[in-house]
UniProtKB/Swiss-Prot annotation:
General function of this protein: Binds 16S rRNA, required for the assembly of 30S particles and may also be responsible for determining the conformation of the 16S rRNA at the A site.
Record's subunit section: Part of the 30S ribosomal subunit. Contacts proteins S3 and S10.
Pfam families: Ribosomal_S14 (PF00253)
The organism of origin for this protein: Serratia proteamaculans (strain 568)
Protein name: Small ribosomal subunit protein uS14
Gene: rpsN
GO molecular function: rRNA binding; structural constituent of ribosome
Length: 101
């Protein structure tokens, strides 16, 4: 199990990313815009740097819903590989069966 503080940190990151999403997209559009002047781009870069670090979506980590484990995450199910295997062995995942060849 992941520490509760790590799970809470991820929740904060998701909330911050949602809060600053529109502002971040607006600034990035100015930076990558063809019609923007160099001065406007520079101002947008400086404003983007003043936003909280955790408001960037790339700082978020996908975690297992049951344990909070960050590695071995299977996105289709939202579980880590370990919990997915346990659920599959109990028959709780419809259509999923152990590979055999």
């Amino acid at each position: 199990m992941a520490k509760q503080s790590m799970k809470a940190r991820e929740v904060v990151r998701v909330k911050l990313a949602e809060k600053y999403r529109a502002k971040r997209e607006e600034l990035k559009a100015i930076i990558s815009g063809v019609n923007s002047s160099d001065e406007d781009r520079w101002d947008a870069v400086l404003k983007l740097q003043t936003l909280p670090r955790d408001s960037s979506p790339s700082r978020q980590r996908k975690r297992c819903r049951q344990t909070g484990r960050p590695h071995g995450y299977v996105g289709k199910f939202g579980l880590s590989r370990i919990k997915l295997r346990e659920a599959a062995m109990r028959g709780e995942v419809p259509g999923l069966k152990k590979a055999s060849w």
